[in-house]
Regions:
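Active-site loop-to-helix "anion-binding N-cap" substructures in soluble metabolic enzymes
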Residues: 1-231, 237-303
Length: 303
């Protein structure tokens, strides 16, 4: 009897004690076979709670690294080892050391969209859904926010009592969403609130009705009385938006809302990774311990 890929995935989950975690930005058919789907914070938190011995991550490499850092005793497999986030590499250790020398009281606040090496040199990690809460809870006057410039600048407007030093990293997907694209969409759909991810540029945030992480955008759209929305984040979120809100309409602002790295993950690659139990995320234990501290601090401060 010929079985489908989905049936094979379910079979392998049971046979090999695998839990599948997927980010909202992967294709809808991959989200459908996942056990847990969410944003970076949700997935980092859930990775510490799952009972299965093996975690298969459908996302980009820093997400798999975070799961391994938090779960050294578990085997973490990536659906695609070449699915990487360019922004994760847009800061270097020399810059962190330079800022620490210049501002002795600085807190290095590291967005989870970063490599394990960068996390190891940071004081605390954040996601877009908990960055405000974490930064507000820090006693430090100076905040060096890495690697994303746009998210850092947005958080700085909400915490005016602190002084921010910014890095020049960015998400190529969110910075490709231009103000004129949003204004054009607003003309076409004048009754649709604009829901925007804070990795977008300030001029896009200015004309948005709501700013939040992917999970917060999903929550807002689900609870809102509005029946149509303009969505300014990666297209993968449209799958879950539609699943939870079949009676509502969601509009993009252009073809650029597409992360080629997230879209590298396919059902075929999921099956292959499960059958071969690789590519496995491995890490030097000294690095893992150093990178673990800021992640654990994030989970504590974000409660």
């Amino acid at each position: 009897m010929v079985i489908t890929m989905r049936e094979r995935i379910e079979q392998l989950k049971k046979e090999k004690d695998i839990v599948i975690l997927a980010h909202y930005y992967v294709d809808g058919e991959v989200q459908e076979i996942a056990d847990l789907v969410g944003d970076s914070y949700f997935l980092a938190k859930k990775a510490t709670e799952v009972s299965q011995q093996n975690i298969l991550f459908c996302g980009v490499s820093f997400m798999g690294e975070s799961a391994k850092i938090l779960n050294p005793g578990k085997r973490v497999i990536m659906a695609d080892e070449f699915a990487d986030c360019p922004m994760a590499h847009m800061v270097d250790i020399a810059k962190i050391q330079q800022v620490r020398e210049q501002y002795p009281d600085v807190a290095v606040v590291c967005y989870v969209n970063s490599t394990a090496e960068i996390k190891a040199y940071s004081d605390v990690c954040v996601t877009s859904s908990n960055a405000l809460r974490v930064v507000q809870s820090l006693p430090n006057k100076h905040i060096f926010f890495i690697p994303d410039n746009n998210l850092g600048r947005y958080i700085s407007t909400l915490v005016p009592e602190k002084e921010f030093i910014f890095n020049d990293g960015f998400c190529h997907v969110h910075t490709s969403i231009h103000r004129e694209n949003v204004e054009e969409a607003k003309k076409l759909h004048p009754n649709a609130p604009v829901l925007t991810h804070p990795e977008c540029t300030a001029d896009v945030l200015e004309i948005s009705d709501f700013i939040g992480s992917t999970s917060e955008i999903l929550d807002y759209a689900t609870k809102s009385d509005a029946k149509e929305f303009i969505i300014c984040t990666e297209m993968g979120i449209f799958f879950e938006l539609g699943q939870k809100n079949p009676d509502k309409r969601f509009y993009s602002v252009g073809h650029r809302q597409f992360c080629p790295n997230m879209k590298k993950i396919t059902l075929e690659k999921v099956v292959r990774a499960m059958e071969e139990m690789e590519p496995e995320v491995t890490m030097d234990e000294e690095l893992r311990v150093k990178a673990n501290a800021p992640l654990v601090k994030m989970l504590e401060l974000a409660k």
